[in-house]
Amino acid sequence: MKIETLLSKFDIKGINYGPSTGGGNPLLSAEEQLAVVGLCWHESPVGWLLLFVEGLRDVNALKQLQIATMGEALRLMEDWRGVYPEKAIKALCATAIAEATQQQGQICPECNGSAVVVDKNRNRCKCQCCKQGRIEWTQETRFAYFARVLPVTYSRFKRYYSVQNLLVSWLVENRTMAVMAMDEQIQRESHRQIA
């Protein structure tokens, strides 16, 4: 993983190439910017893992995020009435992570996100399956994603749906906390440099 890639994905402001800084000298080096990220990790490790999965498609972060999400799912299902297979927890986690990392919806498989398809006469027309290249998250699309891991009936999925919504909101909350912690740390660092 390149440092520049990581920093660009999180939109860390700190490199200023203006004439007031001596031409091409940055205010914060890449190492200093990574230190800012490191200082914020303790605020919301799950949020950071989610950001790594969302922005960098990091496989190691995905594995750790799945473990953390499974723990949260098990906690949420402690007083669940009835039985459920272990695959249900995995399906809940996979669906929740997918929704939390793709909040605008999944990329449409028919138009590959372009929102335009070519028909058999080579005419370009608007894709009927999506809105602006994304398939929005609805209860049906969540069910389809859930059924990839655990094929169940729709009525059975509706029992898992409440837990799945709680998992998504937990993941999005952690992501927001990580971003806010990073912003606060960057503001503190910039105030220190000004003073």
Stretches with model-predicted labels:
Residues K2, G23, Q102, N174, ...:
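Feature marking protein-protein/ligand interface regions
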